[in-house]
């Protein structure tokens, strides 16, 4: 899953104005993937390209106990929440941050082949919806669009910035689904992932700077963001 991971970020920010900023939540949504692609550069976690391993994704994620086990994801969520708490002294913000990070494993469980573990052990889990594009594509788009629509409905501000963000999300997802498959999972592959995550995160920070919750009142609500 790719852009579907950002659905919990939109949901959290739409529900609570005390949640971290949208850009921060975008970091949290893909935090374990940021970590995965970083750790693969050092050979600590490992993946490879195996064409046809699933109908939609050629990645064989055969060793990723630190980022994509349930325990590993929980530890990343706790660590991210701790950073948010240190920066905000808000348990609400920290809790939403942890929720967004932890959601990554649950969403991956839906689409991955059995390559996810509970704590890095031999038993692996995954419902494998990547083998069923007729299900996986509407699922990912539906999650993202429903959460995005909820965020827009719960906030106010100019529509152009969030529309640009949505267009970027859909463009990157289309490239992921329908672009040419990578030949190798090396440094350039990780760099491409970092670039996509980075662009989307910058756009999310921009969007948050232009929007505020509808229940937020005051003369300067459009310029004062949490």
Over which residues does each language-model region extend?
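N-terminal membrane-targeting hydrophobic helices
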Residues: 1-226
């Amino acid at each position: 899953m790719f852009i579907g991971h950002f659905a919990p970020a939109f949901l959290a920010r739409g529900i609570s104005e005390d949640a971290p900023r949208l850009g921060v939540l975008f970091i949290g949504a893909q935090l374990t993937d940021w970590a995965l692609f970083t750790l693969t550069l050092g050979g600590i976690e490992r993946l490879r390209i195996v064409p046809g391993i699933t109908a939609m994704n050629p990645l064989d994620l055969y060793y990723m106990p630190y980022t994509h086990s349930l325990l590993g994801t929980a530890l990343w969520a706790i660590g991210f929440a701790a950073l948010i708490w240190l920066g905000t002294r808000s348990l609400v913000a920290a809790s939403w941050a942890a929720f967004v990070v932890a959601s990554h494993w649950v969403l991956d469980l839906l689409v991955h082949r059995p390559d996810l573990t509970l704590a890095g052990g031999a038993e692996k889990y995954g419902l494998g919806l990547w083998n069923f594009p007729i299900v996986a594509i509407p699922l990912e788009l539906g999650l993202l669009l429903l959460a995005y629509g909820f965020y827009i409905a719960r906030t106010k501000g100019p529509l152009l910035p969030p529309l640009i963000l949505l267009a970027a999300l859909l463009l990157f997802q289309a490239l992921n689904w329908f672009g040419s498959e990578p030949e190798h999972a090396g440094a350039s592959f990780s760099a491409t992932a970092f670039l996509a995550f980075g662009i989307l995160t910058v756009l999310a920070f921009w969007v948050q700077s232009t929007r505020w919750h509808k229940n937020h009142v005051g003369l300067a609500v459009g310029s004062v963001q949490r």
